[in-house]
Amino acid sequence: MRGKETTSFLLAGWYVALLVPTLVFKYTYLTAVSGNLSTQLTLLATSGTDLPAWWVHVRHIVPADFLDVLWLLAGLWLVGRVLLKIPLVALACGSVLTLLVVGGAHMIAVREIGATLTLDNVRITRDWIAEHPDLVRQFLTARRLAWLLAALTWTATPVLFAAACRRLHARHPGASRAVPVATTLVLSYSLVFGAAAAFGSSRSAVSRGFWTSIVSSALSSDASNPDRASIPSESELLTAYERVAFPRGQAEASYVVDIPPSRRVPRHVVIFTLETAPLQYYPLTDNPQLPAFHAMSAHALVSAEHYASAPVTNLAMYSLVTGTYPPPGSPIIRYRFKTDGLADVLSGHGYETSFIESYDLHWNGPLDERLLRDLGFPTIRDAVQMAGRRQTEWDDYRIGLETRAFDEALQHVVGAARRSRKAFVCVQTDLGHFDWLHPPDRRVASAPDRIAYTAKILDTLFERFLNGLAENGLADEVLIIVIGDHGLRFKMEFESLAAPVQYGDLVFNVPFIAYAPGLFPLQVRLPFPTSHVDIAPTVLDLLGIRRQGNLYLGTNMLDQRLADRIVFLPSASFTGLYPADSFRWKDQIYSLHRIVDRVTVQNAHASASASLANRPHLPFSEMDVKRIVSAAKAVFEDTAAYFRRRFTQAPGGSASRE
């Protein structure tokens, strides 16, 4: 009898040791994605009811976690104890430690990006840390080490709980009956309330068990399916997109300025993407402290209302080149495709096309290069390949790589000109990546000062590039796009700037300059929001190249109809990223928060948001926002499927680029 009692005490302690951190993880996660725990969770779970807060938690939020832990313990017992014959104490303590490690890793991900881990972002994180091991030291703070020590101590909970129960039983033998009674109550609660919460709630994302959510997230690799039996035609895709993107329909085309056809001729095109460049910290336009950018802005199309199409570099580049939103699903595009992107179209007009990465293109494996091949770039270089591995101080090395990338871009343009051809070059800069550069005269500088120093370094590189063009007689023969790929993404970036982690301008609003002295004798400032998807059609129109018959979801940025168009800001559409999808229409940004099924709205460029239910005077209701987000995602998925079919079933044979 004593052995059975000891086992029951140990099982009870094991369950408690698994349940408590699970609930901590669950509430930490929901707090991160919903806001204030004491008010938001209760409203989200049973909006519009008068139920007491404690009942909302007991009935809707935690039951599925009791059930998750019950199934977890049962599975561990069956596999570890029955099949593998692992000693119960070792199995219990080892599983608790494993749970704490796995849950802690997910909490770090939630803290940094607002989402749990997926296989993709585990691989990305692993590869990035391998390239930047210094990041590990930044995470090993005294607070985190204290939490690690607490976790190690907690692993002994099953043993300590069983020992405490034995002592209690020795003093009060009748107390042992409490264990089976409590077990029966927990089992009943888990099966009845847990199943109802997880499967019977319309808000199952909140009610679902934490570990169920983790498994679902980890197995989510690519939510979209580009291989479909039925794929809309190009005209059907455009019609569907216009229906969702232009809520009031489209008027006749009119333009901010009219550029005569005599000036819309082929020019050398260079696109520079600035890594992690929120407009708030990269005010490039009309900034006298950045003389090169200031001079460029005087003869350019500029905007303070430009938005990235995704908070990921490779997806942002996809949109810039193709003129379409990136496909929902994994942020790593694994399938092959063929688009009407700039590299393909300009190659067909005699351009020499190339892509230059200012770091190491292969740090995350071969898929980034394959993506660029499918985007139509036959020539791909990276600065590490050209300059070699690090041999100097880290910041000097980064600046050296950037300088090498700019010089290589200049050589491509000059070389094409000498062959009486035009060049299309994309330069993906890396200098703005966190951890920010340190000014050499101030090793202890604030994060804004460090970003300002980065902008000044970039300004000198652009001055060097422009001088090189002028020396070769090409100063007026270029169209240069300077654009941020995306804004901030990780909590460490926000914290370094003493900024709250908010899904909005700091993530998506980026600088934009389209410098072309042969096209813009004066500055042209756009008053309405634009997107990365507008770059490709705008470039083609400015070069006088017809784009009829090609599929673009973007529009010429000079077209005033864009004032009535929705600009989409997707994130939850991509697995492992912040769980909200937004769009801007007019002066409002509407956000659908996936996990908590809540719609918020905020004024463009404002930080505070409010529930859309509290703004009944606005043109969109919660149902409208959900419908728009869902319809847009469907269009983006269908567009990806259309491009996939082009690759595998091109007229007359395979469209393979290999």
Which functions belong to the PLM regions below?
Residues 443-461:
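Active-site-proximal segments of metal-dependent phosphoesterases and phosphodiesterases across multiple
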Residues 188-271, 276-443, 453, 543, ...:
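Active-site-proximal alpha/beta segments of enzymes that process anionic O-linked groups
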Residues 2-218:
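Transmembrane and membrane-interface helices of multi-pass
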Residues 303, 314-323, 497-548:
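Substrate-binding rim/cap in mid-to-C-terminal beta-strand-loop elements of soluble/periplasmic
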Residues 57-63, 329-333, 393-397, 448-452, ...:
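Active-site rim elements
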Residues 6-13, 87-89, 162-167, 180-185, ...:
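Membrane-interface soluble catalytic domains
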Residues 447, 470, 474-477, 481-520:
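Histidine-centered active-site microenvironments of extracellular/periplasmic hydrolases
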Residues 413, 417, 466, 479-481, ...:
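Short, hydrophobic alpha-helical segments
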